[in-house]
Amino acid sequence: MALDQQRNWTIAMADNLERVKRSARGGGKPQDEVGAGAETEDTQEYRQHTGPPIYLPDEIIIQVLEYITRLKDSQRTLASCCLLSRQWYDAAVPLLYAQPYLYGKNFDPFVRTMCPSINLHVRKSPLSELVKVLNMASLVHQGRPSLTARLLGRAKGSLEEFVAPQASFALNCLAGLSKCTKLRVLDLSLVSEAPPLPDLFKAVAHLQDLRTFRLPRSGGFGAHHKPASFTWSPNLEDLSLSGGIDGHFLHGVVTFPQTLRSLTIEHCPQAKGYAITHLLKTAVRPLRNLQSLKIRFMPRLSSRALDDILFLLPQIQRLSLSVDYITPAIFDENHFNHSYNKYVLPSLSGADDDDQLAAVEPLQHNNLRTLELTNSGDPGVEDKISPIDIMIAIDEGSLPRLRQVRVAKTLLWHSSLTASDAEALADVLIEASKRDWEDGVGVFAGGGQGAGVGKRMDREEQERRKVWEQVAGVWMFDG
């Protein structure tokens, strides 16, 4: 049987080879048979694309394209969609240029498309008005400051988010930046040679729509400025201070915009502990809308420089700190009592200091819901804050609303020595979250509408899915 199968296979292959040779010589089937017979697969695929395009309503095409924009490699797919027909081109081009993905090879063609002429009045590209997000973070040595300035000038009418490149952003870019009146996000954190801070603040001070502002890490070194004369954008919500921010700057900051909701202080090698504390108690504490604070990568802070931060900022809901600058005393009630005599704090709402201090509960931080612990890279800090320290603070009532603890993996809470303690802390947080669900408080107030927890679910469905576990516990992240 095996020999018969082998012989049959050999004969079949020989027949196929002979048939291919005849087809190549023009032999094989008669011409009429070829015309009426089955077509090859390549011919079928080719003829499918040469027929008239299938008409689709614009609404359906837009739905398809909006789905494509959520994919990882959407730019290549959107470019292909532009080649299908005029209808697809008109629908896909705005999405293609709204958030272009820029890297080394495509940067020069992008610049030539956006800026076909140096003189704006000679040739103007209509595509420049479609750019809403200009992210140049992937560019290192491509381009030069003059090209960045030209791009900002061409996209000034529509640009909403700008991430500056490392080496091609300079003083001459500020003129174009100041004209981007719709700008909402300005990220200069990667800039290696930052323009002078007074000129930078002057350029962005009148941008009414600016919500997020990240200062360059290289800015402010080698010069002393008067920060009291700096004007912040009036509607700023997210601010990141970094670079050569020193004690002179931090002591001079009088006020931040009351609209500020998130503040990050990082990568400030000249800032010392007393200057940070002064900033927190004079300029940050009066911010009633502030919800999130992050402090990390501050090499001149001492090992206990931020132990008073919970007392200084009772309004904070999310706190992210590097354990390099705190000790377990940050949760200790005796340390809270000591802080009353250590600081003379400004009033939160215009009341006298004595009345304000009497109104604040010294042993509780009633607003903190999320605590994030990171590591700035210094060795030997892994055991400064342990899960037991946080559980003791919860048991003593110092952190009554804490529900989430996020910990960098470099702190080794997942190791065999502390893994059981971390699990016990997670159980405590989840149990407290379940009580919130039962009482309808916190994120579960009003059926969870405030945080999207349990939204459009009845009570039984919420209980079946254990929605309280979605918003409470201990999470590890890379860092």
Predicted feature locations:
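Leucine-rich solenoid repeat modules
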Residues: 3-8, 12-13, 18-26, 30, ...
